A protein has these predicted regions:
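Localized sequence-composition bias
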Residues: 1-206
Length: 206
């Protein structure tokens, strides 16, 4: 089983000289305004509905997605999350035959079908030449900060393929496996709100 490397922004610093809340947020990758936002009516509450059992799909079936979950970093499955907080997306797959160089990935789309963001395991495992026997199970694991989302509904797609980014066999692509419902937002512009590690106005020296 191969686990995607964690984004460097999720890594914990080993030495912090300034322990103020703003500096802690800057080091750990959390929005410096999180405490203020989450304590106000701007908190970006996101309800999560697991729709995997009802999702449409396609693919040749050499590997099949069996479960998709969104959890906290301790593995507790979530039915709601606050935008800007760290989450773990796990895509569990059963191999129906031998699979070489599997690629497991996801997308988050808005109600118009626009892909807001996504990722896969290809680059993480590029130099590993992975191969797994049929009958085994593997999981794609992704840890990231949930972006702040505008009000509305959003869906995750999940997929497992075999090969390379440009030339692959699509074993299983599952549509709309997780539904996100958002009622309140705090970001000011764009399709998604990225947690800001640091925001300031500084006086420049002449």
């Amino acid at each position: 089983q191969s686990q995607a490397n964690h984004d460097s922004s999720l890594a914990t610093a080993t030495h912090i000289t300034d322990t103020s809340p703003k500096e802690k947020a800057r080091v750990h990758g959390r929005d410096m305004r999180a405490e203020f936002i989450n304590g106000s009516n701007l908190r970006n509450d996101i309800n999560i509905v697991n729709c995997f059992q009802d999702s449409g799909s396609y693919g040749v079936g050499g590997a099949v997605i069996q479960r998709v979950t969104l959890s906290d970093l301790e593995g507790n499955e979530l039915d709601w999350v606050v935008g800007g907080e760290p989450v773990r997306l796990v895509i569990e797959c059963a191999l129906k035959r031998d699979v070489d160089n599997p690629i497991i990935g996801f997308q988050l789309k808005d109600r118009l079908g626009q892909v807001l963001f996504g990722d896969n395991t290809f680059l993480t495992t590029l130099n590993e030449q992975l191969g797994f026997a049929g009958g085994r199970s593997i999981s794609g694991i992704f840890e990231f900060f949930m972006p702040r989302l505008p009000s509305g509904e959003f869906v995750f797609n999940a997929a497992i393929a075999e090969g390379t980014q440009m030339n692959h066999i699509q074993h299983h692509w599952a549509h709309d496996v997780l539904l996100l419902k958002v009622r309140q937002t705090s970001f000011s512009d764009g399709l998604v709100g990225v947690p800001m590690n640091y925001i300031a106005i500084e006086l420049s020296e002449n």
